[in-house]
Amino acid sequence: MVRLVLPNPGLEERIPSLDELEVIEKEEAGSRPKWDNKAQYMLTCVGFCVGLGNVWRFPYLCQSHGGGAFMIPFLILLVFEGIPLLYLEFAIGQRLRKGSMGVWSSIHPALKGIGIASMFVSFMVGLYYNTIIAWVMWYFFNSFQEPLPWSECPLNQNQTGYVEECAKSSSVDYFWYRETLNISTSISDSGSIQWWILLCLTCAWSVLYVCIIRGIETTGKAVYITSTLPYVVLTIFLIRGLTLKGATNGIVFLFTPNITELSNPNTWLDAGAQVFYSFSLAFGGLISFSSYNSVHNNCEMDSVIVSVINGFTSVYAATVVYSIIGFRATERFDDCVNTNILTLINGFDLPEGNVTSENFEAYQQWCNATNPQAYAQLKFQTCDINSFLSEGVEGTGLAFIVFTEAITKMPVSPLWSVLFFIMLFCLGLSSMFGNMEGVVVPLQDLNITPKKWPKELLTGLICLGTYLIAFIFTLNSGQYWLSLLDSFAGSIPLLIIAFCEMFAVVYVYGVDRFNKDIEFMIGHKPNIFWQVTWRVVSPLIMLVIFLFFFVIEVNKTLMYSIWDPNYEEFPKSQKIPYPNWVYAVVVTVAGVPCLSIPCFAIYKFIRNCCQKSDDHHGLVNTLSTASVNGDLKN
């Protein structure tokens, strides 16, 4: 077992002893916030961990990597990567009773950069995450109509047909790209602010501010709704989905394993990344939340419970999503077959009703044998249920295109639309609670603002500043900017932060000391599983993921998808390379958090060297003066 611990002078003075912990907890009772009850804490952590990615990214990864086969690497890495790091964050926050900034600076002043990096990432992710909530609110407000506004294409100015862009694509595509985003054809073409998105963005930030105005005192109340309602809605959708035609096609397609995918490195890479991101690790929010617990709270049990709920939610949400996707694919398959039947009937002037989906192939063969030349001129569509099921359905495309299309085909579609977007709103809002906690608490720890400022004022200023910067997402190019930040702000930086967190606890704070802390808090030392994963397995997994990601990304040209009605293959999205100036944005978004860790450590080292030099110089001067005055005695 590795027992290396780096020198860490002054640690005993920076952290309270175990004997002092209970005394400090009693002294903080009136000044430091605490959870009203255990359920409130657990719901907040679950709400932060379980977010939009569980609903729209995990199902896509299952479908892309062999269906049920993806569950194998996902569950393995959940156990060896996700749970150990979650336990570590819970335990260190509860032990040191500080936010992410205070925890790492207490372990060693040079590690304060880890807290700064977490704060930067929380800020940037929160910046665009609340814009998604604004889009959800826009769809929610438009759901109180019959028929739904995205169920039909609008007429052109002459009222003689549909708008050309909508006719070429679909009503759901048109409502998303044109009516909602009014998207441009390039990230360089910023355009103007879309007032309806700005209005929804204002509402989203206002609701968030009201919920987090007093930290856990207010978020602790909101999570009773935001963390539980999504499960109610998911269950309602599952019951409804299972009654729809073709739902089982989607579920069977999702969980049918393709074992050969297990030999694909990308499958393991994506599984590791999904486990990592779905736990909301390294944002700093979980450390802050756990610091409000009682000293003797069982953080080990908490980490296991939250992890099980998180993994279960991912699988449960995937089942719900693919029951709906199965229904949508079956509807499209039936429409495709009916179109081909109509083509055959019109081409050979057959009586209506004679040709059905059951005898269609037989009629095709008869028509081809009867009049091969006329049959050859007919254009039939390719109808394959698996091709409809396997269409990429990741991210916003799943929520705002695929699901909205499926909802339009359901009876009482406005009701299902309202329920769906309420669920997304709750998932997004509860995740934002943790993101903002990861910004507000570190800023308080940095003492940038006067201590006499109330938390309500600091929280309000942060929300206002972030809201103003988020105006960029209300432009015509806003979707492209959001995708850019989503790809780089919460990927590599989080991986590096998490690796540094584990290294700091195991090799700077000392894993033996950490074990004694946990024994004091929960009554027993962590078992051999935690020892091995903390010291070796989890850091190694993160290192491998980072190296694979680095090798893959370095060799790739940065591309993004645009919506261009003039594209030859429209309505397919066109892939084009990013302009050169975007690379500077990527370096800033991903580089600033990563570089803040070594840069702050170097700054601390140089500062300490300068202080030692000054102290030595001051001592020499003092001794010289004393000697001259005859004050020194042998």
UniProtKB/Swiss-Prot annotation:
Pfam family for this entry, one: SNF
Q: How does it assemble?
A: Interacts in a tissue-specific manner with ACE2 in small intestine and with CLTRN in the kidney. Interacts with CLTRN; this interaction is required for trafficking of SLC6A19 to the plasma membrane and for its catalytic activation in kidneys. Interacts with ACE2; this interaction is required for trafficking of SLC6A19 to the plasma membrane and for its catalytic activation in intestine. Interacts with ANPEP; the interaction positively regulates its amino acid transporter activity.
Name the protein family.
Belongs to the sodium:neurotransmitter symporter (SNF) (TC 2.A.22) family. SLC6A19 subfamily.
**Biological role:** Transporter that mediates resorption of neutral amino acids across the apical membrane of renal and intestinal epithelial cells. This uptake is sodium-dependent and chloride-independent. Requires CLTRN in kidney or ACE2 in intestine for cell surface expression and amino acid transporter activity.
Name the record gives this protein: Sodium-dependent neutral amino acid transporter B(0)AT1
Q: Where are the transmembrane segments?
A: 42-62, 68-88, 120-140, 193-213, 222-242, 269-289, 305-325, 414-434, 457-477, 488-508, 532-552, 582-602
What would be the name of the gene that encodes this protein? Slc6a19
Q: Which UniProt keywords apply?
A: Amino-acid transport, Cell membrane, Glycoprotein, Membrane, Phosphoprotein, Symport, Transmembrane, Transmembrane helix, Transport
Expression across tissues: Predominantly expressed in kidney and small intestine (at protein level). Expressed in the intestinal brush border (at protein level). Expression not observed in other organs, such as lung, skeletal muscle, brain, liver and pancreas. In kidney, expression is localized in the renal cortex but not in the medulla. Substantial amounts of expression in the proximal tubules. The distal nephron segments and the glomeruli are consistently negative. In the small intestine, expression is exclusively localized in villus enterocytes.
Q: Which residues are glycosylated?
A: N158, N182, N258, N354, N368, N555
Q: GO cellular-component terms in the record?
A: apical plasma membrane; brush border membrane; plasma membrane
For the Extracellular compartment, the record's topological domain ranges are 63-67, 141-192, 243-268, 326-413, 478-487, 553-581
Cleaved signal peptide residues: none
